[in-house]
């Protein structure tokens, strides 16, 4: 008898919103530091914050896990049609991303930008080889994740059982190494990134056991996460150390059910709009740059703190307002369609 890996409402892992919230704040801090050229020294600004660039891999692993929670069993049991599955992906992503692309084009219009906007609006830009799109440049992560969405039915087949999933993970890890050392394909390539999505799927297959372990043995799970963090900085940010850290972080998160730094109203709120914040934070930075506010203070540290806070707060405000505006537009269009159909 085939074992079912059904994800129910009881499988709601409250800490994941907090994990995503801290990850997006870290990525925003990294981008502000990298683009602002503040000339600040020390471990925090020379190694810690720059390392936050690799938190995108954590997002990929969480995406793999989250998609499995929502759709794995539906795909396996054919309880969702191909049309409904892909419609939901486009409806969730396209309106907000299209709005951002339009704003980016207005801020920096050019023929090249127009071409890139057209590519972005298809959400298929992740299929382009070495696209290096500058319009919403951070959306390369979205491009990779959307290719993952395209391949998700195949992904469900790959992790159809635990034994096969482990074999696929080994192959994906080898492929990751080949991409980096032979094919010269980096993190903007789905094959390079596949290992993170697959490990997210593996964690889904063992989610009940891992959540129980992390819940009962929080100190041990926290210690493993600390060891993974130290290993990352001691051994370097390679695929193995990043996988170790991402797995440790996600497993620790599965055991967080109430209270603490990962489960609280602020973390839940930020985690709920982390996708929007991620896509818009560099647009907010460019606006501040055009207003000559990124170096408002002569002191590099003060200038960085001000800019980072302004970017994060501005991104939150923009995300909330944009979602409100798009919801109003959607409601208006639905009402118009209803009236036309009624007539």
Residue ranges and their predicted role:
Residues 1-178, 273-274, 295-343:
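Membrane-cytosol interface segments of multi-pass membrane proteins
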Residues 59, 76-77, 129-130, 179-186, ...:
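Juxtamembrane membrane-interface segments at transmembrane alpha-helix termini
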Residues 106, 226-328:
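Alpha-helical transmembrane segments of multi-pass integral membrane proteins
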Residues 110-112, 131-136, 179-189, 230-239:
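Membrane-interface helix caps and helix-loop-helix hairpins in membrane proteins
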Residues 113-116, 164-168, 186-193, 235-245:
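Short, aromatic-rich membrane-interface segments at the entry and exit
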Residues 134-141, 189, 212-215, 259-269:
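A cytosolic-side transmembrane-helix exit/cap motif
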Residues 161-168, 212-222, 237, 265, ...:
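Membrane-interfacial entry segments at the cytosolic side of transmembrane helices
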Residues 166-170, 193-205, 221-225, 248-249, ...:
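Hydrophobic transmembrane helix bundles of membrane-integrated enzymes that assemble
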């Amino acid at each position: 008898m085939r074992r079912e890996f059904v994800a129910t409402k009881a499988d709601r892992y409250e800490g994941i919103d907090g994990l995503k919230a801290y990850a997006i704040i870290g990525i925003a801090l990294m981008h502000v530091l990298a683009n602002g050229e503040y000339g600040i020294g020390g471990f925090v600004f020379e190694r810690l914050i720059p390392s936050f660039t690799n938190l995108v891999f954590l997002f990929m692993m969480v995406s793999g896990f989250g998609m499995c929670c929502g759709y794995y069993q539906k795909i396996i049991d054919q309880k969702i049609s191909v049309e409904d599955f892909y419609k939901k992906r486009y409806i969730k992503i396209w309106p907000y991303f299209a709005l951002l692309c339009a704003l980016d084009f207005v801020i920096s219009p050019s023929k090249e930008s127009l071409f890139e906007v057209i590519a972005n609006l298809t959400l298929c830009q992740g299929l382009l080889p070495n696209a290096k799109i500058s319009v919403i440049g951070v959306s390369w992560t979205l491009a990779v994740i959307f290719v993952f969405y395209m391949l998700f039915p195949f992904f469900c087949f790959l992790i159809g059982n635990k034994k096969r999933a482990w074999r696929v993970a080994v192959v994906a890890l080898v492929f990751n190494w080949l991409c980096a050392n032979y094919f010269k394909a980096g993190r903007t390539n789905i094959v390079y990134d596949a290992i993170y999505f697959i490990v997210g799927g593996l964690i889904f297959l063992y989610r009940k056991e891992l959540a129980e372990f992390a819940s009962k043995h929080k100190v041990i799970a926290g210690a493993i996460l600390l060891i993974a963090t130290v290993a990352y900085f001691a051994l370097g940010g390679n695929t193995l150390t990043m996988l170790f850290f991402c797995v440790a972080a996600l497993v620790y998160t599965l055991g967080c059910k109430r209270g603490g730094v990962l489960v609280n109203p602020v973390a839940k709120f930020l985690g709920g709009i982390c996708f929007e914040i991620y896509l818009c934070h560099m647009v907010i930075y460019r606006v501040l740059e055009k207003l000559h506010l990124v170096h408002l203070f002569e002191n590099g540290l003060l200038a960085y703190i001000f800019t980072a806070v302004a970017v994060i707060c501005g991104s939150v405000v923009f995300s909330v307002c944009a979602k409100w505006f798009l919801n109003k537009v959607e409601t208006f269009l639905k009402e118009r369609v209803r009236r036309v159909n009624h007539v």
